[in-house]
């Protein structure tokens, strides 16, 4: 999955992956992470786009740190939410920042643990992945998991949302990620608890049009081992 693919999507505004409201699963399950003692910590949101989920997390009192490849997406997040921001260079990335939200724009694999743990940020205690893991084809997905594990401290608690369907029925993204894949490839780094798995085919016309026979959406609670 080359960067040009995602830049093209944003350039042409083919951003069906973007949701114009806060994700209902975030609203429902974020309290299940039991983060009452982590109000003063940061939440890391990889491949964040311009998601309104960031605003929801910030309104809960969290500092939110995102990472997004496309500069247009980051600019749109701040302008569409009427947020003034400053910019600075951090290594190979550009950092957009306002009081409670920072987004590192550039390649996730160029983001360092040191940048996230600098004195400018609160300690990361949580993370949220709704559209990152499922954005990677299987041959790149494990590299992403290892990078995520390297970026966040031990004991960090995360909410992960995935989709699963017969991959041969539809060319991703979003790519199919099964529960078996999660357990085989993420359990080394994270304690994994599945919170829900629901049939969502009727809510996704694209999948129906392509005659995908079934589609499930799962929610996981993860805890970074260590």
Curated annotation (Swiss-Prot):
Gene Ontology CC terms, in alphabetical order: cytoplasm
GO biological process: methylation; response to metal ion
Main location: cytoplasm
An MF annotation (GO) of this entry: thiopurine S-methyltransferase activity
Catalytic activity: S-adenosyl-L-methionine + a thiopurine = S-adenosyl-L-homocysteine + a thiopurine S-methylether
Record's keyword terms, sorted: Cytoplasm, Methyltransferase, S-adenosyl-L-methionine, Transferase
Cell location: Cytoplasm
Binding site for S-adenosyl-L-methionine: 10, 47, 68, 130
Enzyme Commission number(s): 2.1.1.67
PANTHER family: THIOPURINE S-METHYLTRANSFERASE
Family from the record: Belongs to the class I-like SAM-binding methyltransferase superfamily. TPMT family.
Database matches in NCBIfam families: PRK13255.1, TMPT_Se_Te
UniProt name for this protein: Thiopurine S-methyltransferase
Gene (name only): tpm
């Amino acid at each position: 999955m080359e960067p040009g693919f995602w830049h093209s999507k944003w350039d042409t505004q083919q951003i069906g992956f973007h949701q114009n409201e806060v994700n209902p699963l975030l609203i429902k399950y974020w309290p299940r992470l039991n983060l009452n003692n982590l109000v003063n910590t940061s939440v890391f949101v990889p491949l964040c786009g311009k998601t309104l989920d960031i605003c929801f997390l910030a309104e809960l009192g969290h500092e939110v740190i995102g990472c997004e490849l496309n500069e247009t997406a980051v600019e749109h997040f701040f302008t569409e939410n009427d947020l003034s921001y400053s910019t600075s260079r951090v290594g190979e990335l550009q950092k957009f920042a306002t009081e409670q939200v920072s987004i590192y724009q550039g390649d996730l694999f160029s983001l360092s643990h040191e940048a996230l743990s600098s004195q400018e940020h609160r300690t990361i205690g949580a993370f949220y992945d709704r559209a990152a893991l499922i954005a990677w084809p299987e041959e790149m997905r494990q590299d992403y998991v290892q990078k995520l594990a390297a970026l966040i401290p031990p004991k960090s608690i995360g909410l992960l949302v995935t989709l699963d369907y017969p991959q041969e029925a539809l060319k991703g993204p979003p790519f199919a990620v099964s529960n078996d894949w999660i357990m085989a490839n993420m359990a080394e780094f994270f304690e994994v608890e599945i919170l829900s798995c629901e049939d969502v085919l009727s809510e996704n016309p694209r999948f129906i049009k392509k005659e995908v026979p079934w589609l499930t959406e799962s929610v996981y609670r993860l805890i970074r081992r260590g």
